[in-house]
Regions:
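A short macromolecule-binding patch
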Residues: 131-141, 188, 240
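Conserved glycine-centered short motifs in functionally critical loops
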Residues: 121-125, 131-132, 163-189, 195, ...
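Conserved P-loop/Walker A NTP-binding site and adjacent catalytic elements of P-loop NTPases
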Residues: 92-97, 109, 127-128, 133
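Conserved interaction-surface patches within small, structured recognition/assembly domains
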Residues: 104-116, 379-390
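Short nucleic-acid-contacting surface segments enriched for D/E, G, S/T with interspersed K/R
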Residues: 106, 146-160
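Conserved nucleotide-binding/hydrolysis modules and their immediate coupling elements
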Residues: 96-100, 110-113, 118, 139-149
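OB-fold/S1-family RNA-binding modules
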Residues: 1-97, 113, 154-346, 351, ...
């Protein structure tokens, strides 16, 4: 009845939203994005929804801030390999083969399926270690969307798997059937059509590499171009791919025998670290241990001859790590409390579910105002937190309680500063906006045990809880028994 009074809908076209088409880089690949004319009302609604969402750091990595030239130190003393990466005189990353567990990440095995669990959409695979590894349906080599694990795998079936995450605590290693071979400049993925380029590279360089990859990509293989490929010529990239294809052919030929059996083992940890990290931004590579110097030099000469000039043998009487105070910095990295330059401090606590980092002003009293003091302390903390995450190799969910700031502008500046510091980290991170409670939530890819887990044991007294329950209950029961016995005597 009252329909005639219903307000008619007027759709106005926004002149600002003209039709356009542009090519952008997304997840290492070129994509074409079209935007057209839309109504003003829907345009504003879309912007409101967009503003209400959390922003992920992965979408647009900020440029890596300028840092002092890096150094890499490798020591082979004591029958084990130890590697330190320094920015200036500060230790930022540490790797060792002397820890209680050796990383298996990257190793390829012929495994045997022990259990198929449809309820978990996963299978447990025996691959030669004490604990079986877990293989999720999405990681099975021939898996498709909505595939069922029970349709892909059977009990006692032999399957080629690769370790992508070491066993931690009660959890076994995580496995994948989608095998990949990392090289100096490329990652080769057999039986795949994947083509990707590192998002850390500038657009112009990604365009150059994209043209090269279209020419040299082998049929039946996927390739991912790494950050180290920046400025590398076509011949070097082709050589890297050819070496990786040879590795795959060896694995294919050796894929025989009785499972479980190791098929392909990753190289020594020093070679892995050089492969993943060493680049033109390093000013020196010092190697302590005569017989290993020639091996490393030969590897670099084959893969990155332009870095030959930075390699040096260290033969001084004073230990290499002692000269650069590496062990002192490692000991500090195992502490719960971390002091900041101006007197503030961090408290870092690990739990089964996540890592919590609390920021405090401590001895820092500032000069101008409370707001400025808190702001400066938070900026110092953001830089140190990013370094501690790398040094301690902390992964998983991380929650940071910065000191509260009322200024929204300064909150944004703090978050941008933190993201810039994280851009130095090769491990993938995702950062959310500051929550309503003033917390910064983030994740960091968890691949292997961190520094503390590698060089510590669970306390026998408290079973890792960090506290011991008082004996008040047992004492009360003793007193009650004594009182009862006295009553009986009377």
């Amino acid at each position: 009845m009252f329909g005639i009074f219903k307000r008619s809908t007027v759709v106005r076209k926004s002149e600002d939203n003209f039709v356009k088409s542009e090519t952008k880089w997304f997840k290492g690949q070129k994509v074409k994005i079209k935007s057209g004319t839309t109504s003003t009302r829907s345009f504003h609604k879309k912007n409101q929804r967009k503003a209400s969402r959390q922003t992920w750091f992965r979408e647009k990595p900020l440029p890596v801030p300028e840092v002092e030239k890096k150094q890499m130190l490798i020591s082979y003393k004591g029958g084990s390999s130890k590697i330190a990466i320094l920015e200036g005189a500060t230790l930022v990353e540490y790797y060792s083969a002397e820890s209680k567990t050796k990383s298996l990440v990257g190793n390829i095995y012929l495994g045997k399926v022990k259990n198929v669990l449809p309820g978990m959409e996963a299978a447990f695979v025996s691959f030669g270690e004490e604990k079986n590894g877990v293989l999720y349906v999405a990681d099975v080599s021939n898996s498709r969307r909505n595939s069922k694990i029970e349709h892909l795998l059977n009990k006692d079936q032999e399957i080629l798997v690769q370790v992508v995450k070491d066993a931690m605590g009660e959890k076994g290693a995580r496995l994948t059937g989608q095998i990949s071979f990392p090289g100096r400049y490329m990652v080769l993925i057999p039986n795949s059509n994947t083509k990707g380029i590192s998002r850390r590279l500038p657009d112009e360089e990604r365009g150059r590499l994209d043209k090269i990859i279209r020419k040299i990509k082998p049929e039946g293989f996927g390739v991912i171009v790494r950050t180290a490929a920046e400025g590398v010529n076509e011949a070097s990239l082709k050589s890297d791919i050819d070496k990786l294809i040879i590795e795959w052919e060896k694995v294919s030929k050796n894929n025989q025998g009785s499972a479980p059996i190791l098929i392909h083992e990753e190289p020594d940890i020093s070679v892995k670290v050089i492969r993943e990290h060493l680049g033109t931004n390093f000013k020196k590579l010092l190697i302590e241990g005569g017989k290993h110097f020639e091996e490393i030099k030969e590897y670099i000469n084959e893969t990155s001859p332009e870095l030959n000039e930075i390699i040096e043998a260290y033969n001084d009487e004073l230990d290499l790590f002692e000269r650069y105070h590496i062990e002192d910095q490692i000991k500090k990295a195992l502490d719960r409390k971390v002091w900041l330059p101006s007197g503030g401090h961090l408290i870092i606590d690990r739990t089964e579910a996540l890592t919590v980092i609390d920021v405090n002003t401590g001895k820092f009293v500032g000069k101008d105002s409370l707001e400025q003091t808190v702001y400066e302390n938070n900026l110092e903390a953001s830089e140190e937190i990013a370094r501690q995450l790398r040094l301690r190799d902390i992964g998983g969910i991380i929650v940071i309680d910065f000191i509260d700031m009322e200024s929204v502008k300064r909150q944004e500046e703090l978050l941008n500063k933190f993201k810039q510091e994280l851009a130095k980290d090769k491990t993938r991170t995702q950062v959310f906006n500051i929550s309503r409670l003033g917390l910064v939530e983030m994740t960091r890819k968890n691949v292997s045990a961190g520094l503390i887990e590698s060089f510590s044991e669970e306390c026998e007294e408290c079973n890792g809880r960090g506290l011991i329950i008082n004996d008040i209950f047992s004492n009360n029961s003793i007193e009650d028994n004594l009182l009862e016995s006295d009553a009986v005597v009377e």
